[in-house]
Amino acid sequence: LLELIPDREKFLKKLNQAGLPHVKVSANPAVKCGITGTHVSVHVDGAEEESEEVSLQGSGLESQEVHEHHHGHTHAHGHHHHAGMKDITEQIDRLQTDEAVKEDVKNIYRIIAQAESQVHGRDITEIHFHEVGTADALADITGCVMLIHELKPEQVLVSPVTTGFGQVRCAHGVLPVPAPATARILMGVPCNAGRMEGELCTPTGAAILTYFASAYGRMREMKMEKI
């Protein structure tokens, strides 16, 4: 999304001035697999949050490799290093951005919290998010919402979601891919495992997709204007 707007630096300045706690977002040119693009970095208290690499496996479901899970970040109990939905809502309310943006961010967080509450069999008020994960996810969600508001698309068409496969390690132990919360959020949405082993769609990503999706399906006939 960032590559679709005319002035990236202006947007990043706006995002970093929104008051995201402990977070600084930056973007730099990057080359991966020979393709040039933009790498967006989220630094929490000076340390960059990184995603695990995924591996291409024909259809090798026999692989037992376990990947780290970065965006679930939830527990069904309290702790001083965790934030509940009430805490998250208060953080969002303090952001220096449009009220419509804040409302969308809160709604996306509610999707995640609702899915986690169903997975853990607890009330949504008992769901808590890890402190560092909360800062990282809040930056991801807020940035995406601000970009959607900047672009003002008439509709958002979502292709079938590739979830990945295998196993992922989180605070609760080793879980299947898609993680239980991701699977809950994607109920009723066209999905496939794909051929890349690892977690390709997190609860955060699934919540953003389902919240903004106007329709699901393969790419319709269209003319590309920006990539």
List where the protein language model places each region.
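Conserved phosphate/anionic-ligand binding catalytic regions in large, soluble enzymes, centered on
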Residues: L1-L2, F129-K152
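Short beta-strand-to-turn element immediately C-terminal to the catalytic PLP-Schiff-base lysine
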Residues: L2-E3, Y211
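Glycine-rich nucleotide/cofactor/substrate-binding loop typically near the N-terminus or early
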Residues: L4-V119, A179, M187-A206, M219-M222
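Residues at or immediately flanking beta-strands
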Residues: K24, E126-H128, Q155-L157
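Divalent metal-coordination and catalytic microenvironments
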Residues: V40, D136, L209
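Self-splicing inteins and homing endonuclease
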Residues: S41-H43, G133, V161
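Alpha-helical transmembrane cores and adjacent cytosolic helix/loop segments
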Residues: I111-E131, A135
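Mobile "lid/hinge" segments at catalytic clefts and subdomain interfaces of large enzymes
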Residues: P153-I227
